[in-house]
From Swiss-Prot:
Location of the region described as Disordered in the Swiss-Prot/TrEMBL record: 37-67, 112-155, 226-254, 330-353, 490-513, 661-728, 750-876
Biased composition range(s): Polar residues: 115-131
Protein name: Uncharacterized protein JIP4
Ranges of biased composition (kind: Basic and acidic residues): 37-48
Entry GO terms, CC: spliceosomal complex
GO molecular function: RNA binding
Compositional bias annotation for Low complexity: 49-58, 717-726, 794-808, 842-854
Gene source species: Saccharomyces cerevisiae (strain ATCC 204508 / S288c) (Baker's yeast)
Gene name tied to this protein: JIP4
Alphabetic keyword roster: Phosphoprotein
Length: 876
């Protein structure tokens, strides 16, 4: 397996992690609602809130190995906690009822027209309103909500009743249900969590009272409240500009938003609440693992939220009031449905059993009634026993992952509905301080938050006013492997079930929201997984095919035995000992660097401004030392500490490592001559035959020297033999496009047909060119043309210059080799052509031929009649 495949397996390790848990490690819990029903059946006396929360209450856990670490408690507070010590905190203190003045009589209670409790009495409503709150309340959002619209027109006398002891209480206290949802909740707190939280709360209150002793800037952190204007003072008049001046009045939502933002609230005296949402996607569980193992502290409140979709069929009509009535009557007639509805009171705000829930079994009433008798539905196609079982599994998983030295409060809630709605309800109820979410983005260059995205994590960060922790699931493999090592498979079970090599990671057998389990990864205990992944990785093909066939198809072949956990030779390195040595050095250097960084953090002698520079120096020094240690390995190879074969293997391994790091570059640097942009790009795989063909083709277009100059011929032959590359033609800047083929150089033939001996001598020196050169009768032979080539090594080839005029008369070649220059013969009167000069007065001047044509042979000049002396007379 190559490095990329191995990294992908590590990043996806959270999908295949399992936990092996003993039965005695699970926390036995008790259904508090069932216990309360049992107590009520035995004793009709009302139980106070303190008696439920008392650790010495009659709620005991069953079983031989029962453990009372976590005690039942309420999920959230429905009453404002505005003071340090509330009367509700005192044990055995019941609700005293609505306080009415002493002059109130029973006659006024039954008087609907006048009296203290009449609808027109403003004094009563001013002191006992639904939304009354105390000044300086430190718990925002936990106040009583206003009455629903359906009960605003009810007379005030119908909201009270007289109890058995004569006390007048309100029937609708504390509030009517405002959050109606289908949810089941388990809430447990550690045994000493309540005592620790009371101690911490008193410490916070003491620091608030002594601000100047504990805070450097108390006036900024705790600004004084503005005093209210006295009755005699003139009230401040707010300026409201007219509408015609361009002012747009604020809407109701804008006014409400402005009022909420401008309202000053105090610091909450509730525990630090951490909300974590999980679903069927496996990467969401990584965020829960990280929060339970890293984020939580003592006295924290961890809330685990999970939602399930509704299974109600919406394709049947519900408009008929009679059908709705029959369904409600059918639910009320079934005693099991009534008892199920009583047990579904998961929240203290949802106490009414008259909440209408549609059956989701079918549109026909007969089918609904028949199936409802055999299937007790809690809501939307789910049974209460099924949800409670999953709820218990989630709670067991949470209590198992939490470290033993953490004293926290745990709330696990399963809601039926859409994710957005459930999150909004959970935020409004629990008022979390932090939200923990996960993402599949893992690259360091990739942003974990995208502002224009509809993903849940992006919406939480952009729209919700809550600090959010984003956990990249694909980078948390160290955390998951640590969990696997802590909850590994017992040795006895491993010996019974394993008959051969077994992969460490394996898939989960169920896709539901049950407890994920972890299997053991066969690695050394001192391995650092970010570096040792280079050493201990499975092979791409796999040597143990028998064990692979025995394993299931959904198991990940991530780790094998020690014999098979070496990478392929071509993957990273070609020697096992070199890899082990590199990993050991990297692990040792990392541990040393981590220790130095930890010492720098706890060193009080270092100024705060220099601490980061000190850490940077430690990192740079460790990196340089590690580089020197790697060089020492290569030095030991060069010094002959190992045999030749092993040294060659190590060297090839390092070269392969360099190739992987550089992205496919050649392992060794080969010095190549500098190439010019004017060079012809030759094929690098050229053979000797191609170079010979280039040499022969070059010799065919060379200049043919005169027969009387054998020295020049030898020089030209040696020069052509030394060249190995095909040249490229380079023209001068004065060459015109209209010149055509004439710009290629002199095309006048140098062959002389007068002397056959000279032809034989020339053939003796250039026999290979005469055999290869094409000879077409009536056409001239091409003259040689030199070019500029940079690839000629140390030879200085100059550019060939071509002169052009209106009529191309002569061509000069400027070569670097002086031996190649051929002196042109002197033209005398004996060589004049008939067309070289015209008749007339100036015919006696000697001139050269103006015709550039080479069709005229030199033997024709001998047969041509020659002109004599002056005025055509012969020479005397």
């Amino acid at each position: 397996m190559v490095v990329r495949d191995q990294d992908e397996a590590l990043r996806n390790s959270y999908k295949y992690v399992k936990l092996y848990v003993r039965q005695d490690q699970l926390e036995d819990t008790v259904d508090i609602l069932a216990k309360q029903d049992e107590d009520k059946s035995n004793n009709d006396d009302r139980r106070s809130l303190a008696s439920i929360l008392d650790s010495s209450s009659s709620v005991k856990k069953k079983g031989k190995g029962s453990n009372e670490k976590y005690l039942p408690c309420v999920s959230f507070n429905t009453v404002p906690r505005s003071r340090v010590s509330s009367p509700l905190d005192e044990e055995k203190r019941e609700f005293p009822g609505v306080q009415i003045s002493a002059d109130y009589t029973m006659e006024e209670y039954y008087d609907d027209e006048s009296g203290f409790t009449s609808d027109n009495n403003a004094d009563y409503f001013s002191g006992n309103s639904y939304s009354s709150r105390r000044e300086g309340s430190a718990s925002p959002g936990r106040y009583s909500s206003p009455p629903p619209a359906s009960k605003r027109n009810i007379k005030i006398g119908k909201m009270f009743k007289i109890s058995e002891n004569g006390k007048i209480v309100r029937e609708d206290y504390p509030t009517t249900p405002t959050d109606i949802n289908d949810a089941l909740v388990i809430s447990r707190a550690y045994a000493n969590w309540r005592q620790l939280w009371i101690k911490k709360k008193n410490q916070i209150d003491h620091r608030l009272e002594q601000k100047r002793d504990f805070f450097n800037y108390p006036t900024i952190l705790f600004p004084p409240n503005k005093k209210k204007s006295s009755e005699g003072a003139t009230p401040t008049i707010k300026f409201n500009p007219p509408i015609e001046d361009g002012f747009t009045p604020l809407t109701k939502s804008q006014k409400r938003k402005e009022r909420v933002l401008s309202e000053k609230v105090g610091f909450p005296n509730t525990p630090r609440t951490i909300l974590c949402h999980i679903s069927g996607r496996k990467h969401t569980w990584v965020a829960l693992d990280w929060a339970l193992r890293t984020l939580i502290q003592n006295t924290d409140h961890i809330v685990v939220l999970a939602n399930l979709p509704r299974l109600t069929k919406n394709n049947f009509e519900d408009n008929d009031s009679m059908s709705e009535r029959k369904r409600m009557l059918m639910m009320m007639d079934d005693s099991r449905s009534v008892s199920s509805a009583r047990r579904s009171r998961s929240r203290s705000r949802s106490r009414s059993i008259c909440t209408r829930r549609a059956l989701s079994l079918g549109p026909e009433e007969s089918d609904n009634k028949l199936k409802h008798q055999n299937f007790i539905e809690w809501t939307s196609g789910y049974t209460q026993n099924e949800i409670e079982r999953k709820l218990q599994d989630l709670f067991d998983y949470v209590t198992l992952i939490i470290p033993q030295d953490r004293s926290v409060k745990v709330t696990v809630e399963i809601l039926i509905g859409k994710t957005k709605k459930t999150l909004l309800e959970a935020i409004n109820i629990y008022l979390p301080d932090f939200f923990v979410s996960s993402t599949l983005r893992w690259e360091r260059t990739d942003s974990l938050v995208r502002w224009k995205s509809n993903f849940l994590t992006d919406k939480l960060c952009t729209n919700f006013p809550i600090p959010t922790f984003i956990v990249p699931a694909k980078r948390m493999f160290d955390l998951e492997i640590d969990l696997q090592k802590e909850f590994k498979e017992p040795e006895v079970t491993k010996q019974k079930n394993t008959s051969g090599p077994k992969p460490g990671f394996s898939h989960s057998k169920s896709a539901d929201a049950s407890i994920p389990t972890i299997s053991n990864i066969k690695r050394k205990q001192d391995n650092d997984y970010s570096i040792d992944s280079l050493c201990y990785a499975p092979e791409a093909n796999g040597a143990n095919n028998s064990s692979r066939e025995e394993a299931s198809d959904d198991e990940l072949n991530a780790f094998k035995d020690d014999e098979n956990d070496v990478m392929s030779v071509k993957s990273l390195t070609s020697n096992i000992s070199v890899k082990e040595k590199l990993c050991t050095m990297a692990r040792k250097r990392r541990k040393s660097m981590a220790q130095q960084l930890n010492d720098a953090d706890h060193d009080s002698s270092i100024p705060p401004g220099q601490r980061h520079l000190k850490k940077l120096n430690i990192i740079l020094e460790s990196s340089l030392k590690f580089s020197l240690e790697i060089d020492s390995i290569t030095d030991s190879i060069e010094n002959g500490d190992v045999d030749e074969k092993r040294a060659h293997s190590m060297e090839s391994g390092f070269e392969e490592l360099k190739r992987v790091i550089t992205g496919g570059a050649p392992p060794r640097h080969v010095a190549t001559p500098q190439r010019s942009m004017l060079d012809v790009l030759d094929n690098p795989s050229s053979s000797r035959s191609k170079s010979k063909s280039r040499s022969s083709s070059k010799s065919r277009i060379r200049d043919k020297s005169k027969p009387s100059s054998p020295t020049a011929t030898d020089i030209n032959s040696s020069a052509s033999a030394s060249r190995s590359r095909s040249p490229q033609i380079k023209f001068a800047s004065s060459v015109k496009n209209v010149d055509g083929n004439a710009a290629l150089g002199a095309i006048k033939s140098r062959h002389s047909l007068d002397s056959p001996g000279d032809q034989q001598q020339q053939h003796h020196h250039h026999h290979h060119r005469d055999t290869d050169q094409l000879s077409v009768p009536g056409l001239p032979h091409l003259a040689p043309s030199k070019s500029y080539s940079v690839s000629s090594g140390n030879k200085d080839s100059s550019l060939r210059k071509v002169s052009s005029s209106s009529s191309l008369r002569k061509v000069k070649s400027n070569d670097s080799n002086s031996g190649k220059r051929i002196k042109k013969p002197v033209v005398t009167s004996a060589h004049l052509k008939p067309s070289s000069g015209g008749g007339g007065l100036f015919s006696f001047f000697k001139s050269k031929s103006r015709s550039p044509s080479s069709f005229r042979k030199e033997d024709e000049s001998k047969n041509t009649p020659k002109r004599g002396g002056l005025f055509g007379f012969g020479r005397l």
